[in-house]
């Protein structure tokens, strides 16, 4: 795993952080959906880097020493409460903004990380994103006040787009009769809360193999709610659900909660949920 991160560093991260002549502010986010959001607000006034790059599982992410040295250079860090952030907190001295601070959090009963008290997938909700975009904007204005007009204009545009997105998602799922969703990994609690779904999770909280009791629990859920599809996540829980998919002849649907373009990803999630 460590060799993989060093390889990624040598192939791509060096180029990103090696731009010594740039006068743009260097901004750090924890996962790529927030890279997308910060770039939408900041435009080309900032360089935005993500701790966890695309195609990696944030729940099992490890930081290489060289990568840690590189992220010391940033001037602002937008955090979301993920477990791997604790490693960075000890060595990053820049201003840190907790984007989960003002969110109505869902307790972590069905999510993934035992050491966290809440579900960290807060970006999978247009309502949450409106709060977080405002927090991002205020922090950017404080960091680069010369661009305040641009930041506030882009923030207002994003807020309007989120209102439209919320309406579109509501329309997509409005006629859906199946409101129970079986997922390999509990990533969709906020989306479910916003749009009237109930999330049932296959995976155990500690990522361990399913016990016989777990299998019975999932089988009962499938029967009780007449479920015919299961949501597989790009980075989590696919192995534990494979046997159940075969046994019950279920339709697998692959989603990626960590896709960079969070707006289009929310539409993809809505479409998937509407066709269960």
From Swiss-Prot:
GO molecular function: metal ion binding
Keywords: Metal-binding, Periplasm, Signal, Transport
GO cellular component, one term: periplasmic space
Principal location class: periplasm
Entry's Gene Ontology BP terms: cell adhesion; metal ion transport
Keyword Lyase: no
UniProt-listed Pfam families: ZnuA
Annotated signal sequence range: 1-18
Residues noted as binding a divalent metal cation in the record, renumbered to the chain: 59, 121, 185, 256
InterPro entries given in the database record: Bact_metal-bind_prot9, Lipoprotein_PsaA-like, ZnuA-like
Subcellular location: Periplasm
Top-level taxon: Bacteria
SUPFAM superfamilies: Helical backbone' metal receptor
PANTHER family noted in UniProt: HIGH-AFFINITY ZINC UPTAKE SYSTEM PROTEIN ZNUA (PTHR42953:SF3), HIGH-AFFINITY ZINC UPTAKE SYSTEM PROTEIN ZNUA-RELATED (PTHR42953)
Entry similarity comment: Belongs to the bacterial solute-binding protein 9 family.
Protein task: Part of an ATP-binding cassette (ABC) transport system involved in metal import. Binds a metal with high affinity and specificity and delivers it to the membrane permease for translocation into the cytoplasm.
Protein's name in the database: Putative metal-binding protein CT_415
Organism, scientific name: Chlamydia trachomatis serovar D (strain ATCC VR-885 / DSM 19411 / UW-3/Cx)
């Amino acid at each position: 795993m460590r060799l993989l991160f060093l390889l990624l560093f040598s192939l791509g991260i060096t180029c990103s952080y090696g731009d010594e002549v740039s006068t743009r502010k260097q901004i750090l986010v924890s996962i790529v959906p927030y890279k997308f959001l910060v770039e939408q607000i900041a435009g080309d006034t900032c360089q935005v880097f993500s701790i966890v790059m695309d195609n990696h599982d944030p729940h099992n992410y490890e930081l290489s020493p060289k990568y840690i040295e590189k992220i010391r250079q940033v001037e602002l860090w937008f955090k979301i409460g993920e477990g791997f952030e604790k490693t960075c907190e000890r060595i990053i001295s820049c201003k840190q903004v907790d984007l989960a601070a003002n969110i109505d959090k869902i307790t972590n009963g069905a999510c993934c990380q035992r050491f966290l008290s809440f579900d960290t997938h807060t970006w999978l909700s247009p309502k949450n994103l409106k709060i977080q975009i405002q927090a991002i904007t205020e922090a950017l204005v404080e960091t680069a006040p010369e661009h305040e007009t641009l930041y506030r204009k882009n923030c207002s545009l994003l807020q309007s787009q989120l209102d439209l997105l919320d309406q579109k998602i509501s329309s997509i799922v409005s006629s859906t009769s199946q409101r129970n969703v079986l997922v390999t990994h509990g990533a969709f609690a906020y989306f479910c809360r916003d749009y009237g779904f109930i999330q049932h999770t296959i995976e155990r909280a500690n990522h361990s193999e399913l016990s016989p009791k777990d299998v019975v629990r999932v089988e009962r859920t499938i029967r009780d709610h007449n479920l015919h599809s299961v949501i597989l996540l790009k980075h989590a829980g696919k192995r534990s659900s494979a046997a159940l998919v075969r046994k019950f002849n279920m339709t697998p649907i692959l989603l990626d909660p960590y896709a960079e373009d969070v707006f289009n990803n929310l539409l993809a999630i809505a479409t998937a949920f509407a066709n269960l």
